[in-house]
């Protein structure tokens, strides 16, 4: 523990392949006395160089996430509540790294999440399957009459992918999710992974198609989210294409589009 003039916290937290300058980050986002934690792929040591830092400030504010760019690095800033009850959100806090928590309030919340891990995971899986059913039902009812029917089908497939990922105790992470799905052990449930990826259409991934998808996904994000998330989308799609991860890029762009389509 290192003391600074504004607060008591670690100057740096080092993970497998990067170090996070906590002191400068907390000053940059001006968190005051609220607990702060980091989740996402960076927290689980499987992030790519293009991945952002997912930072949650537990200030209880009901506002959309924002994007911060600092020294060429992107931070996705979320606002959370210490009294959160939604399994979809609590799941994102599982195994979170505490960056600032003088009153141990966040530590207590994370301890409760750990105790109820199985219940939270099961609730999330159930919610995903319900959402998948709704999407498929909408596609079926509007097939041939609605130009969005195919979008509903793909959205349903992504919800099923979320459920399969969670059944395998892997928190959904769109940039890395296809890789994880491929690596899961064989089982009756995991046999549906092939059906999911075929429904999404990852075999169609080509550099030219991905360039068009990237542009449309960024534009859709700007229209729906209005928080500069499109900059992260552009950086990730560029990285994945340049590293020949075409199917992963297709899956990622489709996942982001699904989220905004549902919104």
Predicted regions and their residues:
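Residue-level signal for well-ordered alpha-helical segments
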Residues: 3-6, 13-15, 32-34, 105, ...
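Intrinsic-disorder-associated interaction segments
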Residues: 3-4, 8-15, 99-106, 118, ...
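Conserved nucleotidyltransferase catalytic core and NTase-mimicking acidic/glycine-rich helix/loop elements
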Residues: 123-263
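Generic alpha-helix detector with strongest preference for long hydrophobic helices that associate
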Residues: 3-7, 37, 84-87, 106, ...
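Glutamate identity and glutamate-enriched acidic tracts
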Residues: 8, 27, 52, 65, ...
